[in-house]
Amino acid sequence: MQWTHEQSPIIQSKASKILVRAFAGTGKTTTLVGFAKANPTLRILYLCYNSSVEKAAKGKFPRNVVCKTAHSLAHAVYGIQYAHKKTKNLRLTDIARGLDTQDWELVRDVLATLNNYMASADAELGRPHFPRFRDKAFLTSAQERFLKQGLDMARVVWRRMVDLQDTGMLMPHDGYLKLYQLSKPDLSQRFDCMLLDEGQDINPVIADIAHWQRIRMAIVGDPHQQLYRFRGAEDALNSDWMVGAEEHYLTQSWRFGPAIAHVANIILSYKGETRKLQGLGPQTLVKKSLPADLPHRTFIHRTVIGVIENALQRVRNNPAPKFYWVGGIDSYSLRDLEDLYAFSRGLRQNVQNKKLLRDYRDYTQYVEIAEIS
């Protein structure tokens, strides 16, 4: 493969820490594959953001690369121990049942505190993880009591979660990942180098795991595509532990042509970006609106419900539309919506997810809890 003048120095680098700031469509993952192929004797870990990325990466990287999510690494050490009490996510009803309380406002704060703690790099669960009073410098005596009660309950739940014998409180995936991070795993016994893609959106837990490694490190990301800051994700490209790294840039995009690149550069200039994105892909047009008779069009939404509402609107306007659902229609939780509709109408026999019936007395209670949370 013919590498560009931007990719070649990255692929040939011998630096212990490599940092690549890359624009959209500039071949971030392709460059990492090239780096791996250029270093066939290195035992490389490609740390994937999620399982779908892991699956796709396994078909791209050479045999000296192990493609894993952080959860996969943690599962081999801790997750497997909790197989008998594992769950995808903790829910309000799990917390309420475990604490034997119907104070849903308090339960919501306890759950949020636990999720914040599990997503953080912190060793101890404490006030910084309690969302309600996070920005308050001073609290009233009543607020102090509520804070103490919430933190005490969150610690009780955490202790029960990590207790292998306590099957009354389940262990979520983020829980055993937290245990793995707290153990400060040393990956140098298995790997010589770690590759991190999407470095602009690293979970603090994963960032902490990477931070403690003493092996070669290459991080690639686009600082203009931070999507998960609302979940606490951090930009590893600007982290203290990457200070002194050999820096590179990827600015040539094959995803679109010069027209889109021109508009993107105008927008990015307002963020202070001085490097220019180059559009070397297919010729593209940027218009204020789409022609009414356009046979195909794509709609992008920030939320799943936005996609579903748009699809419903299209059905109203056209009785026989043809849709392509990115990721497959099953990934949009339509079955859950159908269950909720049946539940709201008292048609319990039509609800397929029986856990919904066990967790909530009726639809009124479901709405009450949903509004609080």
Locate the predicted segments by residue.
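Non-catalytic, alpha-helical, charged scaffold/linker segments
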Residues: K322-Y360
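Conserved helicase motor core of SF1/SF2 NTP-dependent helicases
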Residues: R21-T26, T30-L32, A38, L42, ...
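Conserved helicase NTPase motor core
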Residues: W3-P9, K17-L19, Q149-D235
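ATP-hydrolysis module of ASCE/P-loop NTPase motor domains
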Residues: Y82-R160, R348-S373
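Non-catalytic, well-ordered alpha-helical scaffold segments
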Residues: K68-H71, H75, W104, R108-A112, ...
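Active-site catalytic microenvironments for nucleophilic, acid-base chemistry
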Residues: A38-N39, K60, I80, G98, ...
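Conserved P-loop NTPase-based nucleic-acid remodeling module centered on helicase motor cores
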Residues: S51-A121, N318-L334
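P-loop NTPase Walker
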Residues: M1-A83, N265
